[in-house]
């Protein structure tokens, strides 16, 4: 399983890169899809026969469906009870956290954290 966020994906350097509808976001969608495909390809090369990809950024409609690796099974769209981990169950052998941002208070790109009772550093 891959839980794929966009804020730590290849090329992302500022907020405008991940805001749906912007020119920068359109460019980053291609790079994000490439990151996911590279991960899927690596998992398949390592023996995976099917890879669930839970898209986990913003409205969760960022990956380019027509370019997604054929071994990927995509879970997309909002209102998932388990949010970024939707799809996890006893059949999942492992999880890759791909493209996640750094934690609030760190010096990384787009650093923020969602905690159980609070939200910190949302831009």
Features from the language model and the residues they span:
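N-terminal glycine-rich anion-binding loops that anchor highly charged ligand groups
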Residues: 1-18, 28, 32
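Short beta-strand segments
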Residues: 3-4, 54-55, 95-100
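Short, well-ordered, mixed-charge alpha-helical segments that flank or form enzyme active sites
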Residues: 10, 60-63, 102-108
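A solvent-exposed, charged loop/short amphipathic helix patch at secondary-structure junctions
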Residues: 14-27, 113-123
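Alpha/propeptide regions of enzymes that mature by internal proteolysis
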Residues: 23, 27-54, 60-63
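Short coil/turn connectors at secondary-structure junctions
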Residues: 46-49, 70, 90-94
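A glycine-rich helix N-cap at a beta->alpha junction
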Residues: 69-89
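Internal, conserved structured core segments that host functional sites
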Residues: 84-123
